[in-house]
Design a protein with these regions (language model features):
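Conserved hydrophobic/aromatic packing and binding residues within compact polymer-binding modules
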Residues: 12, 26-27, 37-40, 66
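DNA major-groove recognition helix of helix-turn-helix/homeodomain DNA-binding modules
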Residues: 50-65
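Recognition helix of helix-turn-helix/homeodomain-like DNA-binding domains
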Residues: 31-47
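A detector for short, charged/polar N-terminal pre-domain segments
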Residues: 1-7
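Short amphipathic helical patch at the helix-1/turn junction of helix-turn-helix
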Residues: 6, 17-18, 45-46
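Short, charged recognition helix plus adjacent turn
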Residues: 2, 57, 67-70
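Short basic helix-loop element that most often maps to the first helix and adjoining turn
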Residues: 10-29, 54
Length: 70
């Protein structure tokens, strides 16, 4: 499970940076805290199901695309 959190976090940061968003901007767009975004990106914890749709929408993606790891 820890590996999945790290993979998700790495992917989330990559997608956020590719779109030119700061953690603060993503947090505002998803009604999450900056700390939550930071913790997800560092693999400390993964997103709750209800937040996946918010994150995907803010990044203009489908939810499954958040999990397309290399």
């Amino acid at each position: 499970m820890a590996r999945l959190k790290v993979q998700f976090g790495t992917r989330l940061k990559l997608l956020r940076v590719e779109r030119g968003l700061t953690q603060e901007q993503l947090a505002d767009a998803t009604d999450l805290t900056i700390e939550s975004i930071s913790n997800m990106e560092r693999g400390i914890f993964g997103p709750r199901f209800d937040n996946l749709e918010k994150i995907a929408a803010a990044l203009e993606l489908e939810v499954h695309q958040l999990f397309q790891f290399d």
